């Protein structure tokens, strides 16, 4: 019997140690929390996209600060997909659905 895991308040998936631009999900989803675990030298970004290139402020959902910390995004929805660009030289962990 297939299992279905509905989205939970904190997301139902996590990707750790993101150090380069990454497509987390190539379908609509939600961003819950971004944790900067290694500080960077410039801010990163979250995009509503399914491509690693060509992203602009037109499809940017938010910025990822360069300082170590946990930053909530409260289940912000995406229409296309989820692309994470971590702070330059930094590493992040992301919870999403």
Each predicted region: which residue ranges?
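Surface-exposed, low-hydrophobicity beta-strand/loop segments enriched in small/polar/acidic residues
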Residues: 1-97
């Amino acid at each position: 019997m297939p299992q279905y895991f509905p989205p939970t308040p904190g997301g139902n998936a996590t990707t750790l140690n993101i150090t380069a631009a990454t497509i987390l999900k190539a379908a609509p989803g939600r961003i819950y929390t971004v944790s900067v675990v290694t500080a960077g030298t410039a801010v990163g970004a979250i995009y509503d996209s399914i491509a690693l290139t060509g992203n602009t402020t037109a499809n940017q959902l938010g910025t990822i600060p360069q300082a170590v910390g946990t930053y909530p995004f409260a289940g912000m929805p995406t229409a296309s997909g989820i692309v994470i660009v971590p702070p330059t030289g930094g590493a992040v962990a992301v919870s999403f659905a």
